[in-house]
Amino acid sequence: MPKERVLNIVDICTPQRIGFRNFPDTSPHDTTKALRKVEALDFDRIVPGHGPASAPKAEVTAIREYLEDLTRAVSAAKEKTGNQFAVDQITELVKADLRPKYGQWGEFDNWMMMNVDRILLEQRLGY
């Protein structure tokens, strides 16, 4: 809705909630790139499809930053454990790292393991 400066954006940006990252075609790497393109668009508010009826543009940036922070935290935890397949241990380290900034977001504890697992998969595939 250009006149209203509102962007309808579903599934890749749910304000204040970490994403459900377990669909076969989910790619945090590609989502991060897409969110950067969305951030460059001229709009003020989003209609996310999940969560609140609308939210400010800043929520797009917050989700992108979460994905970048998640990727960094997974890499650090993987290095610390020395085992890319220690998903439980890596997830606990990532939760501890990200909890101060994102711990109040919806599904933080419930969906973090699938977020970590998806980042690990992408790293194994060379993203």
PLM regions with names:
Residues 1-69, 76:
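Metallo-beta-lactamase
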Residues 40-42, 53-127:
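Accessory terminal helices/loops
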